[in-house]
């Protein structure tokens, strides 16, 4: 199983479909939502493998479960929540960061 950590970004709906097409039934997507807003502007995928949660909520911890059980942990945007999550991982966990243009432009230009 692959754990994907995502934010409400325009490219994520397409990304979810691509991963599920390439590796069906082997993906769990966490979409971080703003606790004040409780909904997304861009991602509207209604599938059992897509979860909309606030980081560190009880629901988040239950959905993620045992991090050592994942074949891959894939970061789709390096935000505050994903950084905090990475700091909690035990040694030896493989993490892949898929960088996209928005991250580069926002942080380095």
Where are these regions (language model features)?
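Short glycine-/acidic-enriched loop or helix-start segments at secondary-structure transitions
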Residues: 14-16, 83-87, 107-108
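N-terminal subdomain of nucleotide-sugar transferases
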Residues: 1-44, 70
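Conserved nucleotide-sugar phosphate-binding/catalytic loop shared by glycosyltransferases and other
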Residues: 31-32, 36-60, 64
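Short His-Asn-centered micro-motif
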Residues: 5-7, 33-34, 75-78, 99-100
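Short N-terminal targeting/anchoring amphipathic segment
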Residues: 63-82, 94-98
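Short, conserved loop/helix-junction motifs that constitute active-site signature segments
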Residues: 22-25, 87-93
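Acceptor-binding helix/loop patch of EC 2.4 sugar-transfer enzymes
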Residues: 101-109
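Short beta->alpha connector loops
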Residues: 8-12, 56-57, 77-81
């Amino acid at each position: 199983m692959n754990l994907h950590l995502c934010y409400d970004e325009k490219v994520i709906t397409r990304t979810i479909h691509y991963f599920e097409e390439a590796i069906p039934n082997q993906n769990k997507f966490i979409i971080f939502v703003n606790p004040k807003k409780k909904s997304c502007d861009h991602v509207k995928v209604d599938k059992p493998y897509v979860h909309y949660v606030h980081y560190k909520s009880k629901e988040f911890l239950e959905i993620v479960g045992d991090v050592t059980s994942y074949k891959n942990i894939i970061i789709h945007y390096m935000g505050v929540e994903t950084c905090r999550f990475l700091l909690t991982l035990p040694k030896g966990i493989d993490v892949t960061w898929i960088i996209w243009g928005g991250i580069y432009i926002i942080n380095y230009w």
